[in-house]
C-alpha cells in the first residue's frame, strides 16, 4: 500500500512539474508577466524611504549553523509531515535535475545572506540571496521582469509569496542619489525664500541657495539660475554662463533649456545667429511641452518667420497654450499687467502710462487710514490683482476689504466673498463664509455679489445646486454690466445648463464679456470660431482671439520686469527680456526692443547689429498695427539705417501709416517727399494737400505745417519764375493767384524768420553759445554715424 501511495505521489509530482514547466514556457513567450509574479511599476515603490544604504550585492559563505535559518523556513519545515517532506524532495528533484534532492536542500540551507557593510536596496533593505522569482533562483540582482532594465532583488526568499523587493544600486548610484536628495532640500529652501518674500535682499539670498543646488546638477535649480543669469534677475547678467547652463540642460532633455537655447540662436546672444538651429530647438522645446516654445512657434507660423504661413498650425499651438492659460484663471481674476510702450512715453512725456506714482499711493493709503471707504476698496483691488506699480499682496487686500466691509461697503463684501471662495495662503478657503458675504452684497444690489451668489448656486458651493436661482442672479449682474455675470450667462446658454441650449445667446453674452476684457470670454469665443459652433468657422478669427488669451499668461508679468529694468538704467537686462517676449509675439515688446536698440542704449548688441535688429523688430511691430513702428520703418529706409536708402519703400510705409492709422507725421512726411520729388514724382500741389491733411489730423502739426507751407510758397514762386518768360513776368504775375490771398502774411513770416536768424547769429557770436536748432518738419532720424545723403534744409 505504501508503495502504491509513493508511486501515486511521484506521478503527481511529475505531472505538477510538467505543468509548471509549460506555464514557464508560456510566460516567457508572453511580454507581460502575470500580476502575481511580475514586478510592480516604479510608482509602487514611491512610499519607500530613500535614505537607505549602498548595495552592490551580497557576500555568501557556506554555513552549517542551523541558527542562520530564517524563521519562515523553520516554521514551514516544522509544519510539514514526513510524507509532505518526501513529496517536496521529489518535486525539488524534478525541478532541479542537476542536483539530488538531498544536495539541493543542503545547498539551499547553506547559502544564507550574510549582512555586510555593503548591503541592501536603495531603500535600505537587505537583499535576500538566493531568492525565487518565476520559480527561478537568483544569486545576484537582476533586471528580469522589467522593461526598463533596472536591477532589482527580493528582500525575502520567495518573491511570488511575499512580493517584497527593491531596486539595487551601485556605490556611484547611491552617491548620486544622496547628492540629489541634498540638492532637492537646498532647492526647496531657496524656493521657499523666493516665494515668501518681496524684498530684493532675501530674493538674492534665495538665488544663492538655487546656485548651490544648480552646482549639484539639480535640473529645476539649473533652469532657474540660467534664466536669472540671462535676464539679470537678482544675479549679475552673464550670457555666457547662461548659455553653458542651457546647453547642459539641453543635453539632459530639458524643454526650458531647449527653448532658451533657441532664443540665443535667434538673437545671436553668446552664439552666432542661426535661424535654422533656433527653429530646431524651439520645436524640441514645444514637443517637450514648453508653453513659451509653443507661443514662439505659433507666432512664427502666424507671421511666416522661417516657416510657411499656416493658419491651422498657428491654431494648434495657440490653442494648446490658451487651454493652460484659461485653466489658470482664478475667481479673483489673477494679476494685471501694464503694457507700456517706451516710444510713446518718450514722445509724449505727459501721457498717462497707467502707473501710479509713489506719492499718489501714499496719499490713498493716508485716506484709507482716515476711514475713506472708496480709498480702502481701491487699494484692496490694487493689492488683490497687482499692477499699476503696486505689487500683488493678498494680506493687504484682505485688510483693506475688511475695513471697507465693516463700514458697510457692498463692493468690499463681494470681494471678500471672492477671496474666501478662491482661498489662498492668507485667506483659508470657506464656501460658507464666501456665501455669507455674497448674500450680504447681493441683497444690497451689488453685481459682484450677485455674480458670486450665482456661482454658488450653479456649482453648489456651500448651498444646494439651483440652476434657476443661478440664472436669476447672473441676469441681475449682467444687466448692471458685470462681466462675470455676462460670462456665466453665456456659459449656461452654451452648455444648456438650466436653460435650453442657445448658441446665439451664448455668443451675445460672450461678446459682451469680451468687451469688458474678460479672458475667458475671449477663450470661449475662440473655441466657437475654431470649431464653427454657433458661428461660421473662421481660423483667422480664432487665432486672433487665442493669441489674445495666450498673451495674458503668467509670462506676461515679465513686461513689467523689463520696464522696471529699463527705468533702473539696466538697458541690457531690459532689452534681453523684451527680445524674448518679442519672440513670443508681443507687439509692445517688439516696439520696446526696437526702441532701445534704436537709441543705442544696450551694449549687449554689437554696433553693426544695432540698426538691422531694430529694423527687424520695427517691421514686426508694424505688421501688428503699431503706427510709430510703421513711421520708423519709413524713416529707416529714408535715411538708410540698417538698410540701403530707398525712398520708394519709405514712401510706401508713410502712405500705409497715413491711410491705415491717419498719422499726421506720416502725412507731413508724404508732403515733404512730394515737395522734393523723393521716391515719387515732384508735385507741389500734392505736397500742399498732404501738409493740409497733417494740420487737420493733429493740432500739434499746425505750426510745422505753417512753416512748411511758407517754404512751399517760395519754392512754387521760384519754380514759376524758372518756367515763365522773364519779360512777361511783371505783366502776368498775380501774387494772390500765385501764393494765395495771404501771400503778404507769408512774406512777413519769411522776413521775421530771417530777422530772427540774424539776431540769433549775432548773439551766438557775442556769447559764444551755440543756438539750438529748431525741430524740422521732416522725418526725425535716429542718431547716425554721418550725415545722410539727402538732408532737407533747416
Curated annotation (Swiss-Prot):
Stretches for region Interaction with ERLEC1, OS9 and SYVN1: 22-737
Residue positions with a glycan: 195, 217, 272, 431, 608
Residue ranges, annotated region (Mediates retention in the endoplasmic reticulum): 738-794
Residue numbers bearing the Phosphoserine modification: 63
Lumenal-facing ranges: 22-738
Sel1-like repeats: from-to residues: 183-218, 219-254, 255-290, 291-326, 373-409, 410-446, 447-482, 483-518, 519-554, 627-662, 664-699
Biased composition (Acidic residues): 23-32, 62-77
Membrane topology of this protein: Single-pass type I membrane protein
Subunit structure: Homodimer and homooligomer. May form a complex with ERLEC1, HSPA5, OS9, and SYVN1. Interacts with FOXRED2 and EDEM1. Interacts with LPL and LMF1; may stabilize the complex formed by LPL and LMF1 and thereby promote the export of LPL dimers. Component of the HRD1 complex, which comprises at least SYNV1/HRD1, DERL1/2, FAM8A1, HERPUD1/HERP, OS9, SEL1L and UBE2J1. SYNV1 assembles with SEL1L and FAM8A1 through its transmembrane domains, but interaction with its cytoplasmic domain is required to confer stability to FAM8A1 and enhance recruitment of HERPUD1. The interaction with SYNV1/HRD1 is direct.
Function, as annotated: Plays a role in the endoplasmic reticulum quality control (ERQC) system also called ER-associated degradation (ERAD) involved in ubiquitin-dependent degradation of misfolded endoplasmic reticulum proteins. Enhances SYVN1 stability. Plays a role in LPL maturation and secretion. Required for normal differentiation of the pancreas epithelium, and for normal exocrine function and survival of pancreatic cells. May play a role in Notch signaling.
Protein name: Protein sel-1 homolog 1
Amino acid at each position: 500500500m505504501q508503495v502504491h501511495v509513493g508511486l501515486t505521489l511521484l506521478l503527481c509530482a511529475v505531472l505538477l512539474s510538467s505543468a509548471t514547466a509549460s506555464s514557464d514556457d508560456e510566460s516567457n513567450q508572453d511580454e507581460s508577466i502575470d500580476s502575481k509574479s511580475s514586478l510592480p511599476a516604479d510608482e509602487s515603490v514611491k512610499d519607500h524611504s530613500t535614505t537607505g544604504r549602498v548595495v552592490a550585492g551580497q557576500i555568501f559563505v557556506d554555513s552549517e549553523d542551523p541558527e542562520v535559518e530564517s524563521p519562515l523556513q523553520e516554521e514551514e519545515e516544522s509544519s510539514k509531515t514526513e510524507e509532505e517532506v518526501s513529496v517536496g524532495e521529489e518535486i525539488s528533484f524534478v525541478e532541479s535535475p542537476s542536483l539530488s534532492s538531498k544536495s539541493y536542500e543542503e545547498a539551499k540551507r547553506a547559502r544564507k545572506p550574510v549582512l555586510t557593510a555593503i548591503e541592501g536596496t536603495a531603500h535600505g533593505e537587505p537583499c535576500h540571496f538566493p531568492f525565487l522569482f518565476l520559480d527561478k533562483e537568483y544569486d545576484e540582482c537582476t533586471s528580469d521582469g522589467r522593461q526598463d532594465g533596472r536591477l532589482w532583488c527580493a528582500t525575502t526568499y520567495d518573491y511570488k509569496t511575499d512580493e517584497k523587493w527593491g531596486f539595487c544600486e551601485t556605490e556611484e548610484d547611491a552617491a548620486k542619489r544622496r547628492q540629489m536628495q541634498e540638492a532637492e532640500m537646498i532647492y526647496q529652501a531657496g524656493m521657499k525664500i523666493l516665494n515668501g518674500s518681496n524684498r530684493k535682499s532675501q530674493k538674492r539670498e534665495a538665488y544663492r541657495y538655487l546656485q548651490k543646488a544648480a552646482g549639484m546638477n539639480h535640473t529645476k535649480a539649473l533652469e532657474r539660475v540660467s534664466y536669472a543669469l540671462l535676464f539679470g534677475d537678482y544675479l549679475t547678467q552673464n550670457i555666457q554662463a547662461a548659455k553653458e547652463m542651457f546647453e547642459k540642460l539641453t543635453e539632459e532633455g530639458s524643454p526650458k533649456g531647449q527653448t532658451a537655447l533657441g532664443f540665443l540662436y535667434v538673437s545671436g546672444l553668446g552664439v552666432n545667429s542661426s535661424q535654422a538651429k533656433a527653429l530646431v530647438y524651439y520645436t524640441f522645446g514645444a514637443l517637450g511641452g514648453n508653453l513659451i516654445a509653443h507661443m514662439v512657434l505659433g507666432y512664427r507660423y502666424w507671421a511666416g518667420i522661417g516657416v510657411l504661413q499656416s493658419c491651422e498650425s498657428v491654431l494648434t499651438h495657440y490653442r494648446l497654450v490658451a487651454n493652460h492659460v484659461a485653466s489658470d484663471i482664478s475667481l479673483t481674476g489673477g494679476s494685471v499687467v501694464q503694457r507700456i510702450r517706451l516710444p510713446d512715453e518718450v514722445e509724449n512725456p505727459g501721457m498717462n502710462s497707467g502707473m501710479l506714482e509713489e506719492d499718489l499711493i501714499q496719499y490713498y493709503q493716508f485716506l484709507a487710514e482716515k476711514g475713506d471707504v472708496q480709498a480702502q476698496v481701491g487699494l484692496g483691488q490694487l493689492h488683490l490683482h497687482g499692477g499699476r506699480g503696486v505689487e500683488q499682496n493678498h494680506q493687504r487686500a484682505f485688510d483693506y476689504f475688511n475695513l471697507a466691509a465693516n463700514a458697510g461697503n457692498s463692493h468690499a463684501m463681494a470681494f471678500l466673498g471672492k477671496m474666501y471662495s478662491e482661498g489662498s495662503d492668507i485667506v483659508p478657503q470657506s464656501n460658507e463664509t464666501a456665501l455669507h458675504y455674497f448674500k450680504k452684497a447681493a441683497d444690497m444690489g451689488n453685481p459682484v455679489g450677485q455674480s458670486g451668489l450665482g456661482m454658488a448656486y450653479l456649482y453648489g458651493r456651500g448651498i444646494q445646486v439651483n440652476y434657476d436661482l443661478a440664472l436669476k442672479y447672473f441676469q441681475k449682474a449682467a444687466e448692471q454690466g458685470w462681466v462675470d455675470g455676462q460670462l456665466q450667462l453665456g456659459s449656461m446658454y452654451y452648455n444648456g445648463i438650466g436653460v435650453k441650449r442657445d448658441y446665439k445667446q451664448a455668443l451675445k453674452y460672450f461678446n459682451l464679456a469680451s468687451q469688458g476684457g474678460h479672458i475667458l470670454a475671449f477663450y470661449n469665443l475662440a473655441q466657437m470660431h475654431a470649431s464653427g459652433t454657433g458661428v461660421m468657422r473662421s481660423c483667422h478669427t480664432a487665432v486672433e482671439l487665442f493669441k489674445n488669451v495666450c498673451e495674458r499668461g503668467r509670462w506676461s508679468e515679465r513686461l513689467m520686469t523689463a520696464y522696471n529694468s529699463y527705468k533702473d538704467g539696466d538697458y541690457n537686462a531690459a532689452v534681453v527680456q523684451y527680445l524674448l517676449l518679442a519672440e513670443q509675439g508681443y507687439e509692445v515688446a517688439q516696439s520696446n526692443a526696437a526702441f532701445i536698440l534704436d537709441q543705442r542704449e544696450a551694449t549687449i548688441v554689437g554696433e553693426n547689429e544695432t540698426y538691422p535688429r531694430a529694423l527687424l523688430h520695427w517691421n514686426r511691430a508694424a505688421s501688428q498695427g503699431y503706427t510709430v513702428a510703421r513711421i520708423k520703418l519709413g524713416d529707416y529706409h529714408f535715411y538708410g539705417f540698417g538698410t540701403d536708402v530707398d525712398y520708394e519703400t519709405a514712401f510706401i510705409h508713410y502712405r500705409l501709416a497715413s491711410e491705415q492709422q491717419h498719422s499726421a507725421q506720416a502725412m507731413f512726411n508724404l508732403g515733404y517727399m512730394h515737395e522734393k520729388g523723393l521716391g515719387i514724382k515732384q508735385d507741389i500741389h500734392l505736397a500742399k494737400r498732404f501738409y493740409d491733411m497733417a494740420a487737420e489730423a493733429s493740432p500739434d502739426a499746425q505750426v510745422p505745417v505753417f512753416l512748411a507751407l511758407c517754404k512751399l510758397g517760395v519754392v512754387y514762386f521760384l519754380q514759376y519764375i524758372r518756367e515763365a518768360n522773364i519779360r512777361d513776368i511783371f505783366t502776368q504775375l498775380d501774387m494772390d493767384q500765385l501764393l494765395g490771398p495771404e501771400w503778404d502774411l507769408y512774406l512777413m513770416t519769411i522776413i521775421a524768420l530771417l530777422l530772427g536768424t540774424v539776431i540769433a547769429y549775432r548773439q551766438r557770436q557775442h556769447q559764444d553759445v551755440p543756438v539750438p536748432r529748431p525741430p524740422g518738419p521732416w522725418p526725425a532720424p535716429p542718431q547716425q554715424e554721418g550725415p545722410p545723403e539727402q538732408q532737407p534744409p533747416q
